[in-house]
Structure formats: structure tokens, C-alpha cells
Amino acid sequence: MSNTILQHLPIGQKVGIAFSGGLDTSAALLWMRQKGAVPYAYTANLGQPDEEDYNAIPRKAMEYGAEKARLIDCRNQLAHEGIAAIQCGAFHISTGGVTYFNTTPLGRAVTGTMLVSAMKEDDVNIWGDGSTFKGNDIERFYRYGLLTNPSLRIYKPWLDNQFIDELGGRQEMSEFLIANGFDYKMSVEKAYSTDSNMLGATHEAKDLEYLNSGIRIVKPIMGVAFWRDDVTVKAEEVTVGFEDGVPVTLNGQSFSSAVELFLEANRIGGRHGLGMSDQIENRIIEAKSRGIYEAPGMALLHIAYERLVTAIHNEDTIEQYRINGLRLGRLLYQGRWFDPQALMLRETAQRWVARAVTGEVTLELRRGNDYSILNTVSPNMTYHPERLSMEKVENAPFDPSDRIGQLTMRNLDITDTRDKLGIYTHTGLLTVGKDSMLPQLDKK
């Protein structure tokens, strides 16, 4: 049995808890204090769009018995990692061309490292959070926590049978808080659960576990319900500017920080419901789950970035960018964003792809993921329409005789290909004739 994971409350020891202020972590913190642990509460400010007062959360933790409560501002680091993911195309999950932008994995990478770093400052070497044993987060936090503090031990109340026996459900936790003098009112149960940060929101579980229930039951927190006929969405033009792979302007406006740029990108994209998607994905443990996602700012920046990538880079570079992006997206999803194999892929894309991406892209946003690209401008473009113009041009880069020569050279590999197909036919791997897929390859 692992010595890293504690299955019973460590009495008399400091225990750090990732504290959200919700029912679960509030009850857990009070319970740990009453049972003899010394709880320290750490709250990550990730720019959650559904959080109204971050400063109230540490105060609440102190009321529930925290020895110390700290609010850790993680927004700058989250914005930095979000831009890195866009630069690398680190997104491996998509359906019908609509992308999930790995916003929860990005949030976990930042939370897992920054909260554990804060705990080290307070000499807290035991960490607990609210992730369950069936999900991805339990492994992501485990990896990031131990990367940051190799002496870290893990205690999760939700893996402690005593906690589960005493406070196994939301009703029991609510009654526990009320019995201890806290006027806690359970929030109205939604048909799904929501987790969010500045980059995006995840809606999953409960009714959304059933595939006959979909986006129409979701109330967006970062944008509009674009699928509803009573929601008015007006078309809007927006221009996104990049310098050396970094988004720097929206409609010509510069921003004091990447955080402010993301917030404005969220507002613009959110007015249209841009970046919402419904995905079936494979969790780390290879079981499938379903989520409905929002990421209006990430989607806006990603579309503009990829337009510039295709205008600037050659085909082989774009191919490597896409292949490596799929691999890197999966590593990010698995909680390996800071592993050597991920850093290698990140460095490749950020150095050799992103650094050349300078320019502006103008889009018209409509409803949901419906948009058009109106203009693309870059000093680094290798797109030159005169090279392939259907009109007669002066000083053309090549003429018909050049193309005849190029096509003649193709005879070499065409002949080789025909010979190989003949070998496959002779061995029975292929058949030729009227009803075959290669009816014209018989010897004539």
C-alpha cells in the first residue's frame, strides 16, 4: 500500500485543502478540524466566471476552522499556459471539427503547482482536494503535486471511509454544518455539475451522462444560449492581432496583461456562444465520459492563430504542428503538461511555429461556431496570389514548359507505382477488372 496516500485523517498534523467555499470542502474542513487535524485552506483565483467574491472565500474558511486561509492569484499563470496551448495547438479532442480546448486540464496544471508551492511556504506537506477516484483530476493533482513537492502526502476525505460513513452525501454535509451553527443552505440542484476557470467551463455528470440529454439543458456561464430562438445574436466583426505568436490586440486595442486580453476575448466570443462543444472523450483510465464545454476566448484566439499559421508556414511544418499538437493535447489531458516529453513538443512549436506568427485576422462571428474569415494580413505570409493567378501576369514565376518538365518527372514514380500494383495483383492482394476498385490496371 502506498505511503504517499493517507487513508485516515492525520491527527495533529497540518493538512492543506484546496478550498472552494462550496458544500463539500466546507464540510470537510470543519470535519477535519473537529477530528483533530490542523487544516490550512488554499483557494485558487482562476478567474472563474461564476465566482462573485473571491475574498470572501478565505474568510469563510477561517469561520469553518482553518488555521490559515490564503487566496492564491493564479490568473497570470493560467493565461500564460492558455497562450502556450494555442501556440502549440495542444488540443486532441474534437467532434465534427469542433474543438475542446483542454481548459480544465490547463486549470489543473496551474492549480496543482501553485497551491502546492503555497503550501510549501507554510510547511504544509499533506494535501487534500475534492476530486473523486473515478475522474481525471485525482491523477492530475497527484502528478502536479508530487512534481512540485516530492515530500507531499495525499489525504482526501472522499477516500476516507470514516468521512464517507459520517458525511457521505450532500444532505448529511448540509445537516452537519447547520448542527454546528452555520446557516448553510444547499444550492438548488442543477441537472449537471459545472467547473470553470478564466479559459473555459465544463458541464458534465448527472443528466448529461445520458446522451439523449444535450446542450439544450445547459445554461451557459460564459456566453449565450445561441440555440434558442428567443436569444438575439447580432453578427459582429472582430480583428485579432498577434506578434511573435502572442495575441496582443483585439479590434486594435492593446491590453495591460494577458488576463485582460482573455477577459475581453471571452466577452466578444461569449456574445455569440463561440467555442461551445459537446464531446465524448476517453478519460485517463480509458473509460468514456461526456462533457459540454465553453471556451469563447480560446476559440476566438485559436481560429485567428491557425489562420495565420496556414498563411505563413509550409505544408510539412503545418503537418508537424498538427501531429505534435494532438500528442501534446493528450499529454496535457493526462496531467503531463510539465513532463519532459511535453516540454520538448512545446518548445518545438513555440520556437519554430509561433515565433513567425505575426499579423491580424478579421472574422465575422454569428451564432455559435458559425463564423467567416474576412481578412488576413501578415508581413510573414508565404501566400502570394500572383504565383497561381488564373489571369495573365507579368514576370510569372513559372510557365507551361516548366510544368511540362515537372509532370514528366512524375513518370518515374507513376511507373513504379503501377509496377507495385501489378505485384499486389499477382499475389492476390488486389483484383482488376470491371467490378474491382482498380478496373483499368489490367495489362493492355
UniProtKB/Swiss-Prot annotation:
Protein's recorded name: Argininosuccinate synthase
Species annotation: Histophilus somni (strain 129Pt)
Localization of this protein: Cytoplasm
Binding sites annotated in the UniProt record for L-aspartate: T132, N136, D137
Stored NCBIfam families: argG, PRK05370.1
Keywords, sorted A to Z: Amino-acid biosynthesis, Arginine biosynthesis, ATP-binding, Cytoplasm, Ligase, Nucleotide-binding
Oligomeric form and interacting partners: Homotetramer.
Sequence intervals crossing the membrane: none
GO annotation terms (biological process): argininosuccinate metabolic process; L-arginine biosynthetic process; urea cycle
Gene: argG
